[in-house]
Every structure is written in C-alpha cells, then in structure tokens.
C-alpha cells in the first residue's frame, strides 16, 4: 500500500513538473521568440518548482510525522520497543522531499530537453506541445493504472488538463504582449 502511494505521488509530481515547465516555456514563447528565453525560463521553472515541491512535501510530511509521534507517545499501552518500531514505520520527511523534487524535475525535463535547443520558434513550440502531450498521456495512464482506474480515461483527462493549462498560459501572456506592445517585451536584448 505504501509503495503504491509513493509511486502515485511520483507520477503526480512528474505530471506537475511537465505541465508547469511546458506551460512556462509556451507562455514565454508567446511573448518572446528567442530560444534562450524559453530555455532559461524552462530551467528556472524546473529549479523553482522542484524546490517548492520539496519544501512543501517536507513541511507536510514533517507535520504528519509530528502528529503521529505525539500520538504514539500519548498511547500509554505501547512499550519503548514498540514505540520505536512504530516511529521507524513513519515516512521520512527528507526522503519525501527528495522524491517530490526528483519527480517534478523528471517531468520538467521532458519539455526542456526535447525543445530547449531548437532555434526556429514554430518548431520549438510545436515540440514542447508534442513532447508534453506524450508525457501527459503517459503520466495520466500510469496514474490510472496505479489507482486502479481506466488508463485511457485517466490519460485523456490528464492530457486535456495539461493542454488547457498550456493554452491558458499562452493566451494570457499573448494578451499581455498585445496590450503592452510598446514595452518591447519580445526583444532579444
């Protein structure tokens, strides 16, 4: 049971990394056609997202750990050896943080590595979308499998959700670029 929960969390973390980094790269691509801008924004999103996921997971798991340790200590009918064994079974906040950061980074690497070094703007954005679509469908199907749900339905749901996130990010930043056209935000300087 615990293994399935870790695997499911890893799939969700990888999906989050993929959607976040791909959406960020596509959003930057909406306002700046420079390949370096997309690459740097994707890398920044990957690092920031992995750190954020790790810190959030560490805090969350540590809070749960503290609650469970306090409960173990309150239970007077557990002797010292049983209490120590119960503590050892609790999840490690450090391991959870590392796993969360790693999962996010793995997902975020997909759009970054498949498109970050393509110079022409159109093919670069197309590769981000295509690689991300394959990853989203795969992560969704894997999540469905691990959760005992229909893999096709789960893969489709994750794919559509990812497309929606990328579309909204592109549209909002494109609108921003149109409104603030005089600010010259798409220069490569």
From Swiss-Prot:
Membrane disposition: Multi-pass membrane protein
Cellular localization per UniProt: Vacuole membrane
The entry's keywords: Ion transport, Iron, Iron transport, Membrane, Transmembrane, Transmembrane helix, Transport, Vacuole
Pfam family membership, one: VIT1
Residue numbers on the Vacuolar membrane side: 32-38, 119-124, 181-189
One GO cellular component term: membrane
Transmembrane segment boundaries: 11-31, 39-59, 98-118, 125-145, 160-180
Keyword NADP among record annotations: no
InterPro entries in UniProt: Ccc1_fam
Cytoplasmic side, ranges: 1-10, 60-97, 146-159
Known catalytic reactions: Fe(2+)(in) = Fe(2+)(out)
Gene Ontology BP annotations: intracellular manganese ion homeostasis
Keyword Transport: yes
GO molecular function terms attached to this record: iron ion transmembrane transporter activity; manganese ion transmembrane transporter activity
Recorded family membership: Belongs to the CCC1 family.
Job of this protein: Probable vacuolar iron transporter that may be involved in the regulation of iron distribution throughout the plant.
Protein name in UniProt: Vacuolar iron transporter homolog 2
Organism name: Oryza sativa subsp. japonica
Upper taxonomic lineage: Eukaryota, Viridiplantae, Streptophyta, Embryophyta, Tracheophyta
């Amino acid at each position: 049971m615990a293994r399935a929960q870790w695997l499911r969390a890893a799939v969700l973390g990888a999906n989050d990394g993929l959607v976040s980094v791909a959406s960020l790269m596509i959003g930057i691509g909406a306002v700046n056609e420079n390949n370096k801008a997309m690459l740097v924004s994707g890398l920044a999103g990957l690092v920031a997202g992995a750190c954020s996921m790790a810190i959030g997971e560490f805090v969350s798991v540590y809070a749960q750990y503290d609650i469970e340790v306090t409960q173990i200590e309150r239970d007077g009918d557990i002797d010292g050896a049983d209490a120590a064994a119960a503590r050892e079974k609790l999840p490690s906040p450090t391991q959870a943080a590392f796993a969360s950061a790693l999962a996010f980074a793995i997902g975020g690497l997909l759009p970054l590595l498949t498109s970050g070094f393509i110079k022409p703007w159109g093919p670069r954005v197309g590769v981000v979308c295509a690689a991300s679509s394959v990853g989203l469908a795969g992560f969704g199907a894997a999540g469905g499998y691990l959760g005992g749900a229909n893999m096709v339905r789960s893969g489709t749901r994750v794919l559509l959700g990812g497309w929606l996130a990328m579309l909204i990010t592109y549209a909002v930043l494109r609108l921003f670029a149109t409104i603030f056209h005089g600010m010259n935000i798409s220069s490569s300087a």
